[in-house]
Amino acid sequence: MSSQYSNVENLSPQTIRQVMRELQEMETTPPEGIKVLINESDVTDIQALIDGPAGTPYAAGVFRVKLTLNKDFPQTPPKAYFLTKIFHPNVAANGEICVNTLKKDWKPDLGIKHILLTIKCLLIVPNPESALNEEAGKMLLERYDDYSQRARMMTEIHAQPAKCGAGAHGDDKDDDGPSTKKHAGLDKKLQDKKKEKLLKEKKRMLKRL
């Protein structure tokens, strides 16, 4: 999903400055549950880590998302993708995100922060009516418990902080510093057991489908 080419040269210096300013502001004062990953050599390739919101099947997961700015930005919206695998009605198999803010409701003054907050909101309130993943949309409407179980299982398998490249355990609110390393081995054993359990659940669930 990483971009094969950059649109930096096609963006106006004013747009580049505005984007960098906004990213630096978010780095200094991050929105709750969102951490931007700045690529200073290519501001058209923006990535961020979004914490799965509490009370959703995505809770305890960390999801890496990517925004790709095209040459007409901000007149036209960027494309947005989940780089972390996720089971969600509004996320296609290739990770592309469908949300009105990036389509008919786009306005040039919305900005990067607004987009990332909208994506986080989509984890709280999916929109099955405009589903890119029809199976997830149908399941959410007709069999919510099954949808929730599948989404939670995908989160536990694919959206663990280490796998998403969060890299900095110190950013986690529950982290108490040195003790994290002490318990790393135990955490790994627990994760392995959890994976075995999830795989069994997955097989059982797939038989029912």
Curated annotation (Swiss-Prot):
Q: Name one Pfam family in it.
A: UQ_con
- The answer on whether this UniProt entry bears the keyword Membrane reads no
Any one GO biological process: exit from mitosis
Its pathway is:
Protein modification; protein ubiquitination
Write out the catalytic residues in the record: C98
What the entry lists under InterPro entries is as follows: Ub_conjugating_enzyme, UBQ-conjugat_E2_core, UBQ-conjugating_AS, UBQ-conjugating_enzyme/RWD
- Quick check: keyword ATP-binding in the entry? yes
State where composition is biased (Basic and acidic residues): 169-199
Q: Where is this region: Disordered?
A: 162-209
Q: Which Gene3D superfamilies match?
A: Ubiquitin Conjugating Enzyme (3.10.110.10)
Record SUPFAM superfamilies: UBC-like
The enzyme's main class, written as a single word, is transferase
Q: Which GO terms describe its molecular function?
A: ATP binding; ubiquitin conjugating enzyme activity
Q: Which residues form the UBC core domain?
A: 14-160
Task: Write out the similarity annotation.
Answer: Belongs to the ubiquitin-conjugating enzyme family.
What protein am I looking at? Ubiquitin-conjugating enzyme E2 S
